[in-house]
């Protein structure tokens, strides 16, 4: 033990460096445990979209259990008829809880394990991103903690399985882009940019669009690095591999979105002006910043000396503008009447989704201010070594306060009372449709509750003859795969309990069988006479499989090049 202590403290510079690293890791670990403590519970955290996200997990699990990968269609939702959520909702990290469910882990435990995982990953990604932006791990951690303490991000915690991950990885993506273009040793940062973008693109569509819209402005602002040929090559590599690695989802998304009219293309809120709040309710929602960020911003404005003060004030003004978009007095209806603008804005659904684009750089400036303020105050008190610890404790306090505030949600938006307290529910039987299970990527003209109640479609496990006669036996279904045997004296046209989507294939005794779209978009088969066995599965159009192979090959090449970059950097 004495040898260990002597080795640890024998050299003051090494000892201080180890203590700093230990302090940073302890701060990260404590913050991650604070942010994830809601999920160390036997029940399922009860939030508005919980049942919907559990359905997504079960849809992926059903596909994996059937041997499908990727799982394009979720065969659990809508009484097993299936939805296109797997194509149009990015859900890469949801494969983790789905795989746990397949392995026998209870659904509630698997879902909470997902949230614990993404909290730790998201905070680490934000820390890494801010470190790349500042070149200092300590300021990077402070910025990550302040960003994670924002009321908006904590509102998403437990509510939006994709948005929380994507927003947490935005600092990483922008940090990797900055390092690639501006940092002295950042020429090898392009693989990190690909990694960060892939997580964003495979988690949330809207935040992917936000990054793609903001990235050109960042490249222009940091354009000095484009003069370096190595940096230009790295930027092109990042763009190319980001496209190739995620091409499998892009191809499927574009195909379906262009051909199928889904519920989500007809938003419930016709205008962004609907989901807004008056000044009093904005105050109750802490302006979606959280009081710690508001107080730090006010203190930074009043500070006499502040590095890059003009840029900070511009960032603050931008945040205030984005916050005003959530105010009921903002003229959204007038803005939406502008040519092309209204159609594009409708995709965002809620104006508050824009706010992280302002909070992200604001957290960086506030972290710098907090670090300088605590260091200066500690020196004046004769305790210079306590400055870092004080700043870290204040940032952790902001996270703790934000969690406490988010656990007592109470404000009004769009005339709707939004109230929530930490509560859990026991999901013994998971409904596959109905309240809290949104039919976002179901045909827009299908209302599942009314349709299933009408009896106009087959019941689960039923093969219904709509023309001719067929005696069915040995029916089996898992995910979007089903099989059955039948006997028909003269052939029959039957409906099976699946919604039709382009890409279904069927076989009768191993020979291809034509599939068609019947009434209410139900998959219909024309069966030949005799005794036969039928199997149905979703494979997707041929270019789905081709794009998946290209993405897989690109991923392997990407990791090989990343390994080469890493070896050169550590040679």
List where the protein language model places each region:
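Membrane-embedded transmembrane-helix bundle of lipid-linked glycan/lipid transferases
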Residues: 2-415, 531-537, 544-571
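Active-site-proximal, structured, solvent-exposed surfaces of multi-pass membrane proteins
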Residues: 17, 455-571
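A generic structural signal for solvent-exposed, polar alpha-helical segments
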Residues: 78, 210, 254-259, 293-297, ...
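Extracytoplasmic
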Residues: 124, 397-481, 489, 495, ...
